[in-house]
Swiss-Prot record:
Keyword Cell membrane recorded: yes
Protein name: Probable potassium transport system protein Kup 1
Gene (name only): kup1
Superkingdom per UniProt: Bacteria
UniProtKB keywords: Cell inner membrane, Cell membrane, Ion transport, Membrane, Potassium, Potassium transport, Symport, Transmembrane, Transmembrane helix, Transport
Length: 634
């Protein structure tokens, strides 16, 4: 509970916590969308890889089914639901959250942890691009079973659905999000019923619960077995979302939803598909939709399309959230971030990220044309992210939880081994499309490394030319040659002990000083959100100058005017109409010689050029902002 709720002078209505079951239902609609739509294609692709063009056998079905069930148990249930979700940063999860959590305890090794965090984030974007494409395609492909005449329209219809999904993102999801949970609950219920109807016709498929069937399959199928194992991983491609979206619903509701609804429904659906294929191997073309009677095909295609849109929405929202975190942590340049809800903190829209995602998703749909072809590109990015999560979780156990080396290694080693086996299996698909998420991830990793390195060089060069603030205030306070003007001037700076460049330029060119001057520093903390009671600190230096520090979490969008207005109880009176904000706008030019390679300095210069203005990012009204330009060679 926030400190604001316990402050006696503020009369607020009592706020009841969101009911546990409501949170669980919400998590079914958001967190489990990706993993919940995997039955549309996972078993089909796994068995196609296992057969390698040969006839489907009972041993193949039982072996692959066993691998799928135990993958759900080991990776999702044991690793994520019961272990990894304990490694939260004030309720938030994800690789960048782990990076922030380790920042103050790793010290000398933090550079390596930063690289791991950036790699995990970059690979997530590869997943965010593939998930909408493969999910929507696999749902719409069900129309072929309704009537073959629909076949030519599957690709354009899928692209139309995806375009519509991305175009309406600016409206936010507040109006329809309440339906996500009930629709996905219906999806899991119908999916489980379809599985049960087929499972009762051949209960012998329950033998797949024995893990020895999976081991035997891998031992006797060589390369085809490894390819099938890579496809089996499609059953858990949404597992990382459980951890990344933890902040929206908290750990226990997500865990309850998994054990009460999602896991039983997935297991029953996969077992039902397996039972059906043991009797009707010819239905491998699309085993999910064959679970249902012919009269139910069209409604199921409609429900599947709705479920895949919801799953895609969850991944898109996750990409926005990750982009915001990366910006706040200094890994990406500033971009416009719009809030789409007045009440829900996590609902944001980032236009630039949205359109880049849409272009990439449409390219994948157009290039691969079917969910089966696209499945070869799926999995590598997620397995890479899971390996990184396991490694970082080990350091959390050691450094944050203070567990011994032996205990930490004993717990993480089995999970890391499984992750590495799946990574190796998925590496076999590199030349069939698996290179795409790796190229996307590698490119984004290069962008983040370049931006972080470039901003450090800029900061170092800026500090070198700055004047100590204490000395400056002493000299300017006794100077009689500087004119005073009415109002308040706020000078943004990254170093509160140095005189802001914008202040020096204002004095040099305008020869004036405001009657009240604020040296403002905006800090991003290593926590998701900063309580309002800890948002600001005010230090009055003398009659002319004050220092203010505003603190925001890496999940927050900084609103500087609003935060300054809240400083009234700390003795700072703020009126936006009598305040001018002075910001330094740095023009980056590639230097020769440079501290970075030529390509990197050119990339950094272009990224800086396309970064959003600080006034927009900090929500400073355009009419109150004064930008002072300066050139820096990097």
């Amino acid at each position: 509970m926030s400190d604001a709720l316990s402050t006696p002078q503020v009369a607020l209505p009592a706020q009841r916590p969101t009911p546990f079951l409501t949170l669980s239902l919400g998590s079914i609609g958001v967190v489990y969308g990706d993993i919940g739509t995997s039955p549309l294609y996972a078993l089909k692709e796994s068995l196609n890889a296992a057969t390698a063009g040969n006839a489907l056998t009972e041993a193949m079905v039982l072996g692959v089914m066993s691998l799928m069930l135990w993958t759900l148990v080991i990776i999702v249930t044991l690793k994520y639901v019961l272990l990894i979700m304990r490694a939260d940063n004030h309720g938030e999860g994800g690789t960048l959250t782990l990076m922030a959590l380790l920042q103050h305890v790793m010290h000398r090794r933090f550079a390596a942890i930063s690289l791991l965090g950036m790699a995990g984030a970059a690979l997530f974007y590869g997943d965010a691009i593939i998930t909408p494409a493969i999910s929507v395609l696999s749902a719409v492909e069900g129309l072929k079973l309704v009537a073959p005449v629909f076949d030519p329209y599957i690709l354009p219809l899928s692209m139309a659905i995806l375009i519509g999904l991305f175009v309406v993102q600016f409206r936010g999801t507040a109006a329809v999000a309440a339906w996500f949970g009930p629709i996905m609950l219906l999806w899991f219920t119908v999916m489980a019923l379809g599985g049960i109807m087929n499972l009762i016709t051949d209960l012998s498929v329950l033998r797949a619960i024995n893990p020895l069937y999976g081991v035997d399959f891998l031992m006797h199928h060589g390369r085809a077995g490894l390819l099938a194992l890579g496809a089996v991983f499609l059953t858990v491609t949404g597992a990382e979302a459980l951890y990344a979206d933890m902040g929206h619903f908290s750990r226990r509701p997500i865990q309850f939803a998994w054990f009460a609804v999602v896991f039983p429904a997935l297991a029953l659906c996969y077992l039902g598909q397996g039972a059906m294929l043991m009797s009707h191997p010819e239905r491998l073309e699309n085993p999910f939709f064959f679970l249902f009677p012919e009269w139910a095909l069209l409604p199921m295609v409609g429900l599947a399309t709705a479920a895949t849109i919801i799953a895609s929405q969850a991944v898109i929202s996750g990409a926005y959230s990750l982009t915001q975190q990366a910006i706040q942590l200094g890994l990406l340049p500033r971009m416009e971030i719009r809030r789409t809800s007045e009440t829900e903190k996590g609902q944001i829209y980032i236009p630039r990220a949205n359109w880049l995602l849409l272009i990439a998703v449409l390219y994948l749909v157009f290039a691969f044309k079917s969910s089966s072809a696209l499945a070869s590109a799926y999995g590598i990015a997620v397995t890479g992210t899971m390996v990184i999560t396991s490694v970082m979780a080990y350091f959390v156990m050691r450094k944050c939880w203070k567990w011994s080396v032996a205990t930490s290694a004993l717990i993480i080693a089995p999970f890391l081994t499984v992750d590495l086996i799946f990574l190796m299996a998925n590496m076999l698909k590199i030349f069939e499309g698996g290179w795409i998420p790796l190229v996307i991830g590698g490119g984004l990793m290069g962008v983040m490394i370049t931006w972080r390195r470039g901003t450090k060089i800029v900061a170092k060069k800026t500090v070198r030319d700055e004047v100590d603030l204490g000395d400056f205030i002493k000299s300017i306070s006794v100077s009689s040659s500087i004119s005073r003007v009415r109002g308040v001037a706020v000078f943004l700076t990254g170093n509160p002990n140095s005189t802001p460049t914008s202040l020096m330029h204002n004095l040099k060119h305008n020869k004036v000083l405001h009657e009240k001057n604020v040296i403002l520093r905006v800090v991003t903390e290593d926590v998701p959100r900063v309580p309002e009671a800890e948002r600001s600190s005010v230090e009055v230096v003398n009659d002319l100058f004050s220092r203010i520090e505003l603190r925001f979490g890496y999940m927050e969008s900084p609103n500087v005017p609003k935060a300054l207005a809240a400083c009234a109880d700390r003795g700072f009176s703020f009126d936006i109409m009598s305040t001018s904000f002075f910001l330094s706008r740095r023009v980056i030019r590639p230097a020769v010689p440079s501290e970075m390679p030529r390509w990197q300095s050119l990339l950094f210069a272009n990224m800086a050029k396309w970064a959003d203005d600080a006034s927009l990012y900090f929500r400073i009204p355009t009419g109150r902002a004064v930008e002072v330009g300066m050139q820096i060679n990097v």
